[in-house]
């Protein structure tokens, strides 16, 4: 197969997995992938998953890749809070949650961290256009904050809660405190319910 034929078929997907290729071609020489990677046409994201090098300079491509590199997953926690202006830090790692085991990946698009949550709380996200029409799964700010409090067990005092450094003005405009209290019990974790109550007290929401 010639590279141009391959590109014409799969470019719209953003990245290409062995499984995706197999759904179109019953016979495919996988050595093509190594050859095209060595030639700079493709970028290896992880074992069995490749992206077109053309996408490398596309704004938002790192975010769009997050839910493709490890699925099912959605962007959450620090990355979403930073993008919403809720925390002051510039988050360089793409933080996501998944129902699969915890994992980390690094490639030319960035560093990716995936942490495990229960399947019954794998909700509270939406599909958004992130790069050249490519969709990605992104948590709402409220869900991102709940995931953060659930996955980090050290926010148990007022001082520790202040260390999240939430912008109080943005917080009051973005997240309803009662919404956090209503959603927290679905995690079936009393510690999270307690952290939400503490957060509401500390930040006045």
Ranges and model annotations:
Residues 37, 43-52, 62-121:
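Short gly/ser-rich loop at a beta-strand->alpha-helix junction or flexible surface loop bordering the NTP-binding
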């Amino acid at each position: 197969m010639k590279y141009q034929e391959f590109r014409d078929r799969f470019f719209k997907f953003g990245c290409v997995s062995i499984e995706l290729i197999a759904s179109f071609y019953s016979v495919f020489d996988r050595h093509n992938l190594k050859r095209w990677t060595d030639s700079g046409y493709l970028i290896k994201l992880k074992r069995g998953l490749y992206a077109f090098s053309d996408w490398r300079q596309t704004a938002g491509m790192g975010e769009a890749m997050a839910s493709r590199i490890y699925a099912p997953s959605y962007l959450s926690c620090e990355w979403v809070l930073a993008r919403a202006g809720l925390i002051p830090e510039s988050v360089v790692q793409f933080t996501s949650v998944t129902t699969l085991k915890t994992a980390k990946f690094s490639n030319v698009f960035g560093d990716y961290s995936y942490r495990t949550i229960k399947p019954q709380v794998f909700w509270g996200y939406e599909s958004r256009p992130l790069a050249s029409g490519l969709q990605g799964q992104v948590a709402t700010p409220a869900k991102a904050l709940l995931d953060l409090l659930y996955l980090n067990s050290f926010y148990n005092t007022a001082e520790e809660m202040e260390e999240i450094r939430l912008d109080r003005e943005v917080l009051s405009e973005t997240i309803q405190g009662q919404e956090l209290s209503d959603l927290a019990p679905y995690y079936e974790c009393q510690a999270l319910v307690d952290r939400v109550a503490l957060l509401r007290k500390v930040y006045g929401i």
